[in-house]
Amino acid sequence: MLTTAPRGTKDILPRDVEAWRYLERTMREICAQYGYLEIRTPVFEHTELFLRGIGETTDVVEKEMYTFTDRGERSLTLRPENTASAVRSYVENKMYADPAPTKLFYIGPMFRYDRPQAGRYRQFHQFGVEALGVEGPNIDAEIILLAVQILQTLGLKDLKLKVNSVGCPKCRPLHREKLQEYFRPHLGEMCKDCQSRFDRNPLRLLDCKNPHDQELAAGAPSLEECLCEECKTHFEGLKELLTAAGVDYVVDHNLVRGLDYYTKTAFEIQYAPLGAQSAVCGGGRYDGLIEEIGGPATPGIGFAMGMERVLLAIESQNLLPQFDNSIDVFVVCPGSANFTLAFKEAIALRREGMKVEFDFLSRSMKAQMKQANRLAAKYVLILGEDEVARGCAVLRNMSTSEQTEIPIQDITSILKTEVQSHE
């Protein structure tokens, strides 16, 4: 147990970190193009925030949260998602006093007690954006375009964008009645989760993963028939903007997402080659959430992207670029006589911005040269006893195998020029 990571968690090893940094860099760069600024929130919050924000009838709250009581008898929860945390920060720090919209993005670990499988972990990472303070469908379209642009920039093709309107408190009661009327005769044959949701939140019956219940849901009354004029106009406006932007989409009237705070727009981006875990991004509008947690009535929309799933997708298609993990200089010091000199020269080169390694183990010249090759060093600086006695060092260009003697006092200036010309 001591040498095994907890089930559902995974080490990100040095050989994998470069891919994560590439993914994060792409996300940050595109967020900057759209004017979104990074926010960093605590990894745990008061449990009440998620109960009220996400909804007590959701799977996340009922089954998946990591909740604990601290020494002050406070109930705290590791964040299962970050929208609730972002809007809590928005209220606490009075960001609503700033000119709208407030445009935020985040990258970080989330925690859910879920069944681990490919692309799904108990500690997982999400990238997400939130836009607060704008009611119209134009910001919905921008959010969706941002998500699509990130995935396309990473090289993913054949993405499937699904959109829907889940209505608002004015039009959902009618849809709720129609759903209960439709599902009531079949309730006995549905799964236990659906039976418990029937009275509390029948909209969630459309989100069930049970194959039998999915077949039933396919014939359920569409929310489109129940939308109020405001929601209809909003949804038509969104579709018009997506069409104008040249973004393909399909309307899926059973798309409701798994969190209770969504209103009006809901969307999901799928990447079919991932199979059962094909959803790489999902989000929607949450116009009542900020008011629900104690802030002023403020419209909002956002999405979250599962970073493990996105990495799985781009790795499966060999879309990761080649990363240059080479070093500039390896300092070879046969024997221990000149170790202090080697250490001093390595430090001087690093202070000039070069990536430098040298041998700590007093290995043979041959072993040190092998290590330089393994590290893909561009140059090797050899501080042999005979050369040092003459006030010189040997500089070897590893790509051409050319060797030259250089004065010790000129090592830094010569290598600085050589490394810059090599780039």
Language-model features: locations:
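TRNA-recognition modules of translation machinery and tRNA-sensing kinases, especially anticodon-binding
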Residues: M1-E423
